[in-house]
């Protein structure tokens, strides 16, 4: 008997789920049961769903896509065929201050592949170029030497000048004017004073900026704390266009793109990566035009139509993306887009490091009324935005729509502090979810990797 599933991989590929897919494994245990192996930390948990209750599966094609060339070849091809600009080697001629912005330790950008090719391209046009690599930490902590060495390798560490951005170092920040939103645009002095500004990065779905990469190298990458906080204000986060995979009408994206233009970001090199963090697609050139091509490719592999259900199972893709609860909000937003109002999200996240943010934890622990919490966020002026407010606001939004049963290694009290229902196995989570929805004919949608899909409502 053949296995038949109602599942969506992308708009172009429906009902073609492969049993050997590296992200999800299904088998027909018996005629009326499907079994899913779902990422959880460095392990996998099994979810068994009866056929009559399975609404569908939302699965990205990203991790099963096979690139036609190696990552290095893809990046080199992109450098040789830029979109919307001359070649970088030609742009480098005569330039005295060249700055290449690179992502920090929190992003799985394959810089060991990309950066040597970018530097070689610059030096082809300008062998004597004074190049500085600027690490775009945004609001994150500083990147350590060990992390830089792991990112770039020994040759770049030994031979290149590397500076780590500090969003609070006022002596090395420069005011460039007002953003369209009214906030002050303040960025790193090295970036502002460069006569050739380049950025490497990667493109993935982003749960309020639409997509990562491109313009984000400037804002939040090398912007001041004040600028980032204003951009992440509650009004922007509440905007219906500030969602995964959406850039048109997205006020956060609009400010970011304006910032990139104001900073004169001349050239980007961005990749799309697979689960092993290897490039499977690359673009280079104009910070908007090249980024558009990259995000269109990504959307073609990741975009799926919502399958409404009473219960939605999601994950954060396992380690290293499910190390804490704060991180796991991203995977929950994929479920938020397809769960029915008043339904249940079962979120699988090892969360071995706990909550992941002091303010994030305290906000939910100390306020039991989610509507009052949301009002506090929305009443806060953009210039009064505080750290992690955006993540808390998004989390509160989805908790107002659905109950979250959180499968993790966390103590029950911590999970309950964050307004969720604790569970420590898939079986326990399903039983609790069924008790909450109180329906005999409940439907379940499964999202094997909530961070790699763009769910269209």
Please tell me what each predicted stretch does.
Residues 143-211:
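An acidic, phosphate/nucleotide-engaging active-site surface
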Residues 83-99, 124-128, 303-311, 339-340, ...:
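Glycine-rich phosphate/diphosphate-binding loops that line cofactor/substrate pockets in enzymes
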Residues 108-126, 328-338:
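Histidine-anchored nucleotide/phosphate-binding helix
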Residues 242-319:
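Membrane-embedded hairpin module used as a gating/binding unit in multi-pass transport
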Residues 97-108, 132-138, 313-315:
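Short glycine-rich or small-residue beta-strand-to-loop segments that form or flank ligand, phosphate
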Residues 328-329, 333-457:
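C-terminal non-catalytic interaction/assembly regions of soluble proteins
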Residues 32-77:
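N-terminal amphipathic/basic leader segments beginning at the initiator methionine
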Residues 179, 188-270, 274-277, 422-423:
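Conserved phosphate- and dinucleotide-binding cores of soluble alpha/beta proteins
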